[in-house]
From Swiss-Prot:
Keywords: ATP-binding, Chaperone, Cytoplasm, Isomerase, Nucleotide-binding. SUPFAM superfamilies: GroEL apical domain-like (SSF52029), GroEL equatorial domain-like (SSF48592), GroEL-intermediate domain like (SSF54849). It comes from Bradyrhizobium sp. (strain ORS 278). It comes from the Bacteria. This is Chaperonin GroEL 1. Its main location: cytoplasm. The gene is groEL1. One of its GO terms (molecular function) is ATP-dependent protein folding chaperone.
């Protein structure tokens, strides 16, 4: 086992604080509408330019192991806030730095760290209640666009695209962000259920100009296994031909004799038919086939359920108004499934989302939910250079999370004002002793820091602005750093999602409290490089 280096009390906290400062100082320059860029070197390709706090935080690794511990703890604040709320990472970092700085001073002055932590917790609890009480639910499209614009560092085009996407696919719908190959940013909305499997054979194509299959009012056969022989399917195919409707086959695979026969029949014009592979793998494939069955009002043909292919009747097949299949995707529009069945299925998926601990599973479940409940919107972000596209894509991702958070818990005045106004609530917090009161005061000073930093980044005097704001009693009256004016921020469209502000404060206080109550640090001692032996001189 490697030898360890151990640091105690003030020495330990000072080292950690240095790391916290290095990371937070690099992140906080990005805060606000006039936040600056940070350029990050990449081991290959052009450097990356970003205004996204968590991206900067994730890139910072310090040489000194004890300083690095402090930096990594604050990086954890940014990552956690990004995971929960999707935005507010810079605010969380700035708050954490302020709480740790003030807390370390108090501990050095001889106060009890555990009482300080208790005071911090009481203050945060009171502020969270105040934020929830003042949060305003958002209903209009304009408000959603405003949230998106603010989170995208004032880019109104991004805000407009997000509002349009959310209007079209609903709050449950999936909105994905991709890099475009052109200069323009565009929005594409896929109505109905889409999955990433194209036609098995190009011979099924009905629209040769666009190279895609279009089936109007088709029957849909959902089969769990491979189809290689057609003998067992003949009774069903005859029934479909007599009905005069097209048929879509969704199966694990269609191969050999089955595929050849279907293609020949399609080319001769006797049978309007197309086949696609089932989406997903393993258990997820079963679940997705079940989703398709519920959406189209059909039954999954599975050996597990004791249903054999030769016994399948038309009533077991799904129906849809239209199916469009291209080389890569299949879209089922307006499935004939019963509304109550679809709602029951979406409720079941929501429960699974709440219970799962895996981020990957959660993402896949949310995709399935969106396909059943709403639709899918794709925002393709354009730009003149690759660096610009990447930077814009970062901002669109941030803005997307922020708008979702705003719909969930409502909005507050932006510009750090909601936290600043919460200083009044702290006057009523009851504490058991002087050290706990000092903990409350640490938060009182820390929640002024975001406003100061936003103003400072805009080139004005932070202390002066904070003083002016505290003189005036109106909750949403604040300083608009983008224009340099004092005004009602909600009316001016400078708004923050309540969830983002709340999460930033809670995460910052949680990690900062841990740093304040730290008394020892343990790290591996750096290994001394062994010098190579000199070559023998026997010549």
């Amino acid at each position: 086992m490697a030898a360890k280096d151990v640091k105690f009390s003030t020495d330990a906290r000072d080292r950690m604080l240095r790391g916290v400062d290095i990371l937070a100082n690099a992140v906080k320059v990005t805060l606000g509408p006039k936040g600056r860029n940070v350029v990050i070197e990449k081991s290959f390709g052009a450097p990356r330019i970003t205004k996204d706090g968590v991206t900067v935080a994730k890139e910072i690794e310090l040489e000194d192991k004890f300083e690095n511990m402090g930096a990594q703890m604050v990086r954890e604040v940014a990552s956690k806030t990004a995971d929960l709320a999707g935005d507010g990472t810079t605010t969380a970092t700035v708050l954490a730095q302020a709480i740790v700085k003030e807390g370390a001073k108090s501990v050095a002055a001889g106060m009890n760290p555990m009482d300080l932590k208790r005071g911090i917790d009481l203050a945060v609890e009171a502020i969270v209640k105040d934020l929830k009480a003042h949060a305003k639910k958002i209903t209009s499209n304009d408000e959603i666009a405003q949230v998106g614009t603010i989170s995208a560092n004032g880019d109104s085009e991004i805000g407009r695209f997000l509002a349009e996407a959310m209007q079209k696919v609903g709050n449950e719908g999936v909105i994905t962000v991709e890099e475009a190959k052109s200069l323009d940013t565009e929005l594409e909305v896929v109505e109905g259920m889409q999955f990433d499997r194209g036609y098995v054979s190009p011979y099924f194509v009905t629209n040769s100009e666009k190279m895609r299959v279009e089936l109007e009012d088709p029957y849909i056969l959902i089969h769990e296994k491979k189809l290689s022989g057609l003998q067992t399917m003949l009774p069903l195919l005859e029934a479909v031909v007599q009905s005069g409707k097209p048929l879509l086959i969704v199966a694990e695979d269609v191969e050999g004799e089955a595929l050849a026969t279907l293609v020949v029949n399609k080319l001769r014009g006797g049978l309007k038919i197309a086949a696609v592979k089932a989406p997903g793998f393993g258990d997820r494939r079963k679940a997705m086939l079940e989703d398709i069955a519920i959406l189209t009002g059909g039954t999954t043909i599975s050996e597990d359920l004791g249903i054999k292919l030769e016994n399948v009747t038309l009533s077991m097949l799904g129906r849809a108004k239209k199916v469009v299949i291209d080389k890569e995707n299949t879209t089922i529009v307006d499935g004939a499934g019963a509304k109550k069945d679809i709602e029951a299925r979406t409720q079941q998926i929501r429960l699974q989302i709440e219970e799962t601990t895996s981020d990957y599973d959660r993402e896949k479940l949310q995709e399935r939910l969106a396909k059943l409940a709403g639709g899918v919107a794709v925002i393709r972000v354009g730009g003149a250079t690759e660096v610009e596209v990447k930077e814009r894509k970062d901002r669109v991702d941030d803005a997307l999370h922020a708008t979702r958070a705003a719909v969930e818990e409502g909005i507050l005045p932006g510009g750090g004002v909601a936290l600043l106004r919460a200083t009044k609530v702290l006057d009523g917090v009851k504490t058991a002793n002087a050290d706990q009161k000092a903990g409350v005061d640490i938060i009182r000073r820390a929640i002024q820091v975001p406003v100061r930093q936003i103003v400072q980044n805009a080139g004005d005097d932070g202390s002066l602005v904070v003083g002016k704001l505290l003189e005036k009693d109106s909750y949403s009256w604040g300083f608009n750093a983008a224009t340099g004016e004092y005004q009602d921020l909600v009316q001016a469209g400078v708004i923050d999602p309540a969830k983002v502000v709340r999460t930033a404060l809670q995460d910052a206080a949680s990690v900062a409290s841990l740093l304040i109550t730290t008394e020892a640090l343990v790290a591996d001692k750096p290994k001394k490089a062994e010098t190579a032996a000199a070559p023998a001189m026997d010549y």
